[in-house]
Regions:
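Conserved alpha/beta-domain cores
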Residues: 1-173, 179-181, 193-195
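Gly/Pro- and small hydrophobic-enriched strand-loop and loop-to-helix capping segments
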Residues: 183-200
Length: 200
């Protein structure tokens, strides 16, 4: 599945994207995502909204107000905050565990045993649903090497949680490598809409 990011786009462009058949939309800034989601609803568009940016725990309640999927869960503390915020939703919030492929603590993403702790916590929650994993290939890595490593982590996760089959990996610059190694969702907003501008 392809997923469009609308971070760069005007309201008219976003309406056109939805009218053109895009069913999943990704956003990485909470302060921009909520008004975009509200505008889409007012225009009669109902895409699935994916939050893909780094998320602070104090924004959990805001995000669950519009997001169908949060792809950037990289700590037990954030998963716990989302679990509390999502209590009472009509349907569980889908969560992807953001994986750090290179283990660099300066980047977003869980590494080592934290991946499995987060996965187990989400899978045990009534308010959350474990969908799978999300990752960004490190810029200095060969994309095939990065996504091959992610595929190994995904295989291990699915062996424990068979429902966690979503692999959100690959962007406009490396989507071919991601697909070769099992990506089910690619993030191609830049290809569709161009580079980021401010919200209009």
């Amino acid at each position: 599945m392809r997923k469009s990011g609308t971070s760069t786009s005007s309201k008219s462009t976003r309406r056109g994207v939805c009218a053109g058949g895009v069913t999943d939309v990704g956003e990485n800034r909470d302060q921009e995502a909520e008004p975009k989601a509200a505008a889409a609803r007012a225009a009669g568009a109902t895409p699935r909204w994916h939050f893909i940016g780094q998320l602070q725990r104090n924004k959990a309640k805001s995000v669950i107000g519009y997001a169908d999927v949060v792809e950037s869960v990289d700590s037990v503390r954030l998963a716990t905050a989302l679990d509390r915020a999502a209590a009472g939703r009509p349907a569980p919030l889908e969560v992807l565990v953001q994986v750090s492929i290179d283990g660099d603590p300066e980047r977003g993403g869980a590494a080592g045993d934290d991946i499995w702790r987060i996965s187990d916590l989400v899978a045990s929650s009534a308010a959350l649903r474990l969908g799978g994993v999300m990752a960004v290939a490190p810029q200095e890595w060969d994309p095939d090497r990065a996504f091959e490593q992610l595929a190994g982590l995904t295989e291990r996760l699915v062996s424990t949680h068979p429902e966690a089959t979503t692999v959100s990996a690959g962007m406009s610059s490396d989507l071919e490598a991601a697909i070769r190694h099992g990506a089910t969702h690619v993030r191609i907003g830049t290809s569709l809409l161009g580079m980021r501008n401010t919200l209009r």
